[in-house]
């Protein structure tokens, strides 16, 4: 029996995706959706325990399988987005694409999702039929969570920041290497 929206999850085993899965479990989100787990490297393998009707991993490159989802949440990275997203939209899929990668951030129909900072923008886009929801740069998002109100009040003109994005974007092994260098 289907429960809620069919939500495809891609990139759920990586650094960003595994944190998302932990958060979704803790908040009971899997009770409200019908999750389908996709993989770029292990299609046909066993899906995680949160799977309901689909107990096997689907191929993350299979456009027909992806089209069955009302929502796709991907933490797989920009190369995946660039390879799959245009084909999926060209196939006529009208579902919601939620993406942690930067690949679509500058598209005209993309909405950066950081609800504590821009909830009115998100709500307006949703009311207009928006369906491309893109995560912001992690460093900038964290910064805006802390100082966004100061920007809105005109008390901050600009800010400069540094990041280890190149390492985190490379995955868990690169982060371990970086942390080992710190001692």
Identify what each model region corresponds to.
Residues 1-183:
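N-terminal Rossmann-like NAD(P) cofactor-binding subdomain of oxidoreductases
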């Amino acid at each position: 029996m289907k429960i809620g929206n069919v939500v495809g999850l891609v990139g759920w085993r990586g650094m960003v995706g595994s944190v998302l899965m932990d958060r979704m479990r803790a908040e009971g989100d899997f009770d409200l959706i019908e999750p389908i787990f996709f993989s770029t490297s292990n299609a046909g393998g066993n899906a995680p325990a949160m799977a309901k009707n689909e107990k096997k991993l689907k191929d993350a490159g299979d456009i027909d399988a992806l089209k069955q989802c009302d929502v796709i949440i991907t933490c797989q990275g920009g190369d995946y987005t660039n390879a799959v997203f245009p084909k999926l939209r060209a196939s006529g899929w009208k579902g919601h694409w939620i993406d942690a990668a930067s690949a679509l951030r500058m598209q005209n129909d993309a909405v950066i999702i950081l609800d504590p900072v821009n909830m009115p923008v998100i709500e307006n886009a949703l009311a207009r039929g928006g369906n491309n929801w893109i995560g912001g740069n992690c460093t900038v998002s964290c910064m805006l969570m802390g100082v966004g109100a100061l920007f809105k009040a005109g008390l901050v003109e600009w800010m400069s920041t540094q990041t280890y994005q190149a390492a985190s974007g490379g995955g868990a092994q690169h982060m371990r290497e970086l942390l080992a260098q710190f001692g």
